[in-house]
Amino acid sequence: MARVRQATRIPVTAGQCEITSHGVRRLVDAGAVDFVNYDVSEGGGVTDWRRAAEICRAAGVRMAHHEESQISRELLAGVPHGTYVECFADPDRDPVWQAMWANRPRVRNGCMEVSREPGFGIQLDWKMVERYRIA
């Protein structure tokens, strides 16, 4: 992937399939990426995501995130090299994302508000949860 990055001026993003900050370090050390979109829910949680973010910051690589905008908006806002939140705000593309929040953040002009609530600021819509409950 480093050769692809060297052959183009198009920024390269990768990391959504990594499950640890060690995998992120390999991408960064190889010079393979301009952005890392390490997924906190697929990887080692918030602590490991922050570890990966520090690896990237030290190397001048920007952070993004793969999906889970309800979590990534807070993480990316908390690091100086955080960039974009991946969000499927179109109800036809992701109707569950539209319905799962009691306090869904506004997406306006391509930007999502960061919560002022404690933690991730997530308040689930329990009617929606009940509708999809299996047991």
Q: PLM features: what roles do these ranges have?
A:
Residues M1-H66, A102:
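Catalytic core of soluble alpha/beta enzymes
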Residues E68-A135:
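Flexible C-terminal active-site loop/helix
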